[in-house]
């Protein structure tokens, strides 16, 4: 019971003090502090019903000619931050992470592993130290694991939790509770997992029965999804024999790269990725690169603003993520990639964008869609400022993100005077740009972001080319991926006013 648990914790603290084990003591006290904060956070912000959502923030951007200049470091990559915690937790020994993204989503992952008994120090100024418990060291959480708004956390953890000795339940906020989870549950069941999603649409909460013996699987992904691929591979760490995933097109490969950085052998042959179960991970140093998905807003802002000159420093340019650079280049943007180097197994570079010429409308290449899936809302703003028509196809995945990003972006673009037609798997946007002209493109208006951080940040960049005031409703979720967004945008010259 609770009293026994309290006595056990006191005994643990006494032993750590007697042994002068300061590392473990700091981790335990950090866990206690974080648990209290996390519980308060869940009480305040856990909205299972949309109409219970108490906190709504909005951005206001006034019209007027603006410049867009400066050198910036955007926050750490969210995908790499999630994985650094997950893999550090099940590694043997200590993992030290720098550049960790202290946003809501990555913190949900961190808290989940604290709830499963992992001692984690930080985060403080992007630094996290994880005292790994090994692949068999996770403990049953006392209650449901709360994933907030993070689909990555839930899908990857579905794979890991399916292989544990204990039962578990994962819940999320109102937005995550609408997102499809059967796409990961189905292959895990084929491996022998007992996993249940909720309702006809297979959404969270997700319930997993532990103590199942998993078998390796050879799975052909029906859609390009790095999250589903990663969930299967992570289950494969505990499965008997080989687990392989074949993807229809390449998706981001952070899981494969980071498993190798932790000493786990992962083979990639074309579009087939495989690993053998039963190995171990060894603690390491992870430097998290700046997030190209966050940098994308500044790339687009600079590309649509006359005379702009923006450099984004130490951005991750993993080849499975650089679709946004390729698409902007095809539209005619003045982008240079400088000072390329490797950090923590990931390629990084400085990206410079200058506003020297009007963008051109294009048919966005379908082979770039999985490589730019999170950047399309920002690219739609670029397309509206381009000369001529832009067509996107093959991007049905956008309809099941934090919001239906095709429909929500189309609604907002129409509100601000842009002619566009959403389709089942994309959109057609009639750009209002003219060669050599840099005047207003958007008329302004009130935009409903549907509490989707990428929608809110994308429409913020429209403020660089607007003739009327832009109000964006429901921007509080920007903190999930880019806590310093308004600060950096305003340093560059955008002038966003934030009201709670």
Go through each PLM region and give its residues.
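C-terminal helix-rich "cap/oligomerization" subdomain common to oxidoreductases
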Residues: 12-51
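Structural preference for solvent-exposed beta-strand-turn elements
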Residues: 49-500
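NAD(P)-dinucleotide binding in Rossmann-like oxidoreductases
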Residues: 1-8
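A subset of signal/propeptide-processing and intrinsically disordered low-complexity segments
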Residues: 4, 14-16, 26, 286, ...
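Short helix/strand-capping connector loops at secondary-structure junctions
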Residues: 8-21, 465-473
């Amino acid at each position: 019971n609770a009293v026994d648990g309290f006595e056990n914790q006191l005994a643990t603290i006494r032993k750590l003090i007697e042994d002068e084990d300061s590392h473990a003591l700091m981790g335990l006290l950090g866990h206690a502090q974080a648990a209290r904060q996390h519980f308060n956070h869940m009480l305040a912000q856990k909205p299972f019903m949309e109409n219970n959502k108490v906190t709504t923030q909005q951005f206001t951007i006034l019209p007027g000619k603006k410049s867009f200049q400066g050198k910036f470091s955007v926050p750490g990559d969210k995908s790499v931050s999630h994985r650094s915690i997950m893999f550090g937790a099940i590694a043997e020994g200590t993992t030290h992470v720098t550049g960790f993204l202290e946003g809501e989503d990555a913190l949900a992952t961190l808290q989940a592993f604290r709830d499963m008994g992992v001692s984690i120090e930080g985060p403080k100024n992007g630094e996290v130290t994880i005292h790994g418990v090994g692949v068999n060291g996770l403990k049953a959480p006392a209650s449901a694991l709360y994933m907030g708004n993070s689909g990555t956390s839930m899908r990857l953890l579905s794979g890991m939790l399916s292989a544990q000795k204990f039962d578990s339940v994962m819940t999320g906020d109102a937005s995550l509770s609408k997102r499809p989870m059967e796409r990961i549950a189905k292959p895990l069941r084929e491996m022998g997992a007992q996993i249940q999603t909720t309702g006809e649409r297979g959404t969270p909460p997700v319930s997993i029965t532990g103590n199942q013996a998993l078998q390796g699987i050879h799975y052909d992904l029906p859609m390009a999804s790095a999250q589903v691929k990663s969930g299967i591979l992570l289950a494969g760490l505990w499965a008997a024999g080989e687990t392989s995933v074949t993807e229809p097109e390449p998706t981001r490969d952070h899981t494969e790269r980071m498993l190798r950085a932790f000493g786990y052998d992962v083979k990639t042959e074309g579009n087939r990725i495989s690993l053998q179960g039963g190995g171990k991970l060894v603690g390491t140093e992870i430097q998290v690169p700046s997030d190209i998905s966050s940098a994308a807003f500044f790339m687009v802002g600079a590309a649509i603003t006359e005379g702009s000159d923006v450099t984004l420093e130490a951005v991750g340019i993993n080849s499975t993520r650089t679709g946004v650079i390729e698409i902007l280049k095809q539209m005619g943007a003045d982008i240079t990639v400088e000072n390329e180097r490797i950090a923590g197994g990931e390629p990084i570079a400085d990206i410079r964008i200058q506003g020297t010429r009007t963008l051109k409308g294009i048919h966005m290449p379908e082979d770039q869609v999985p490589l730019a899936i999170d950047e399309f809302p920002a690219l739609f703003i670029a397309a509206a400022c381009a000369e001529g028509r832009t067509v996107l196809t093959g991007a049905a995945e956008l309809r099941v993100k934090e919001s239906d990003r095709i429909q929500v972006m189309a609604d907002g673009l129409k509100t601000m005077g842009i002619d566009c037609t959403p389709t089942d798997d994309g959109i057609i946007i009639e750009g209002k740009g003219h060669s050599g002209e840099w005047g207003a493109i958007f008329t302004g208006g009130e935009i409903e972001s549907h509490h989707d951080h990428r929608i809110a940040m994308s429409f913020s960049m429209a403020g660089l080319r607007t003739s009327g005031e832009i109000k964006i409703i429901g921007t509080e979720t920007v903190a999930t991926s880019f806590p310093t967004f308004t600060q950096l945008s305003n340093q560059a010259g955008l002038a966003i006013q934030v009201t709670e």
